[in-house]
């Protein structure tokens, strides 16, 4: 998920992460160190991007899914952006100056930037955008991104002053990098309480990004066209068609037929896809992980010993080798090996596969088969639950079936339910939390902060869908926000990872690879572990 293609938020300008390359076989596949593009960029053409998930809306203050984020990154501009090496670069911002020991930032924005309707983007738009989540009437789920923000003030037509309540590295790497600047002249009179449902977000989005919104045929596609007035130069592509496809099988079939020509191919299909005509595949480690989330609102999962037993009962190595054909790495914590904050010198609790031990742990927690029906029970209640995942993600659907089979061996009844993406997002979001357990994934942010997902304050207003609560972890995560020294920050997070791994609010399954299929004649592409369509305005189709 994202999230955000969602979802976790990040800190320092100096961030440089080691990228682990995983080259795929075949003459037409490559890794992210592929040779540089040759030839002069050429204008024209339509790139057809395949997406299993359909966007929900086009406003970064409210969206929580990767599909929406993909479109937002093309429609809007941001004060900063993160490059392919995960370093922060200026974008709309001409300069950023830290003041008062990190408690304020003076931001000067570029002049002459225009929204798609021709109106100039000024400090008024920046102040308006950042004022929305500060309002008591704001109902979005991104509030934690701006918790540190005290105020945003206009200092001049092209200058803004951000004041913080406390030092927080998240502000520089997340609040500036992930907030799409909105047009005040269009939305300024809309009550904040009504802003999320405003038709602007779905029918008439106006940004200042490289592409302009043309149309959205729900269930079919979103069409974008090049912005001739984009402040960093007109895109080479004339149009981008973002095509919504029901599932991965259909997407791979459309990729082979040429109905789409850009798609993140599932691990189960990339070896087949690399044989398709007129395509090439770039493979590299994704900045993400896949997990099973246990809803602790459900009595079944309140006891951490039960959650530990569930993880112990699952053969994650087998899942990686059989479902993914070995194309992944077993995960134990909610952090990617790409991150400088990934703990390399500590041994976190892993709860490795041991069916006998899992049964013993459940028995100690009071779960036994008292009536001989093959299903564990406690106080007259069977250990039975529904495991949900999103429709169209073939790998997750397969994982759900494997989990069902493996847990059956220890006396747990699992019913699988495949749910359309936008419906699943609504079900798991506050105030619904309508799930027992779910197979999902987080697309990590470029700064390793677990606050938004695991802090208890984020249960009712953020991304802590599983109702995880640990007072010690809460304190550590909050304290870490004010730490700017990376070594000290990592030291603090060693304790956080230990506690999360011990509590198992998630069963961390694996770290995946990305396999980006694209036209063989696509030039200008650079692999980005976070954004599939990174710098799409600089891509072109050689003729």
UniProtKB/Swiss-Prot annotation:
GO terms for cellular component: ATP-binding cassette (ABC) transporter complex; periplasmic space. It is found in: Cell membrane. The keyword Ribosomal protein does not apply. It is a lipid-anchor. Residues 1-23 form the signal peptide. A lipid is attached at residue 24 (N-palmitoyl cysteine). PANTHER family: OLIGOPEPTIDE-BINDING PROTEIN APPA, PERIPLASMIC BINDING COMPONENT OF ABC TRANSPORTER. GO terms for biological process: establishment of competence for transformation; peptide transport; protein transport; sporulation resulting in formation of a cellular spore. This protein is a component of an oligopeptide permease, a binding protein-dependent transport system. This APP system can completely substitute for the OPP system in both sporulation and genetic competence. AppA can bind and transport tetra- and pentapeptides but not tripeptides. One of its GO terms (molecular function) is peptide transmembrane transporter activity. Pfam families: SBP_bac_5 (PF00496). Gene3D superfamilies: Dipeptide-binding Protein, Domain 1 (3.90.76.10), Dipeptide-binding Protein, Domain 3 (3.10.105.10), Periplasmic binding protein-like II (3.40.190.10). Belongs to the bacterial solute-binding protein 5 family. This is Oligopeptide-binding protein AppA. Keywords: Cell membrane, Competence, Lipoprotein, Membrane, Palmitate, Peptide transport, Protein transport, Signal, Sporulation, Transport. A lipid is attached at residue 24 (S-diacylglycerol cysteine). InterPro entries: Peptide/Ni-bd, SBP_5, SBP_5_CS, SBP_5_dom. The keyword Ubl conjugation does not apply.
